[in-house]
Amino acid sequence: DLHASGATMVIAEHRLSYLHDIVDRVILLDGGRIVREMPAAHLWAMSERERTDLGLRALRPVTPMQPSLVLHAEDEGSEKNDQGSTAHTTDISTQNAQDDASTRSARGLVLENLRFSYGSHRVLNIPRLELPRGRVTALVGPNGAGKSTLTRVLVGLERARGTIRLDGRIIRSKERTKLGYVVMQDVHRQLFGAEVREELTLGIPSKDLDDDRVDRILIDHGLTDVAERHPMSLSGGQKQRLVVAAAQMVDKEIYVFDEPSSGLDYRHLHSTAHTIRDLAEADKVVVIVTHDEELLAACADHVVKIQPLTRSL
């Protein structure tokens, strides 16, 4: 335990609730300048108004959203699929959630008997999963459970066995690459433009460009002041906001966001949540992968928890 050993620790962080009983002193930075310094006790005693005025994230743990579905759950809900392998799936949703999902089953993505493996190690074994249009579905679970792998399958970057339908029609992986857009956890793999503004317009024909819309999106994501800078020169949080803004510029049917709140403060977390909600309200299929309970509370409609599979092939 570094704290108990007397070591000097410096933690640069937006997520604060887990730092109770760890930090002794708090320094607030703005524009590269120290704007406030205080004992940690003063931070934890702040009112909600003072906290949000300072742009700080939640000081106490957010009540977790309960999953409506648990995939790969090792319990009596296990059942055999047609191939004889175990499909561990437990539905713990309320009746209202079940009824709502059933009315939307024909609209959106439906995965059936989906299986994916790395060599002899099976990562995904999903008898059925519905990802409806017009709602934000959150995938949660421990590292290594297969969340990011599933998102790559959804947008056609990985091929899996089984059937994936969009609005009742089977769509193969090649077609899904055209219909889907993914914001990866490692945003550096998605930054290609020479300037921030250019990043938002890559791949969009000039006849379809709307400069006013580009300006609005830059403003919404707090990127106007860095519009002429190279994307790789931005801070981690600015890069995260840029790839989310780029997703907002394209017109796709399936949007996947892998840890989209990484490096975001209170204001920018909520602007990102607003963007995600806007896409859902535009009747798109929207999926987020996150460990961030604040983001879930801000934009998720329901939660699917993925447990790691324990069996190999």
Indicate where each model-derived feature is located:
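Catalytic Walker B motif of ABC-type/P-loop ATPase nucleotide-binding domains
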Residues: Y255-D258
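ABC ATPase C-loop
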Residues: A247-Q248
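H-loop/switch region of ABC-family ATPase nucleotide-binding domains
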Residues: E13-H14, T290-H291
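Helix-to-loop junction immediately C-terminal to a conserved catalytic motif
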Residues: V155
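Conserved ABC ATPase "signature" region
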Residues: L209-V226
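Conserved ABC transporter NBD signature motif
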Residues: G162-R176
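Conserved ABC ATPase signature
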Residues: H230-L234, Q238
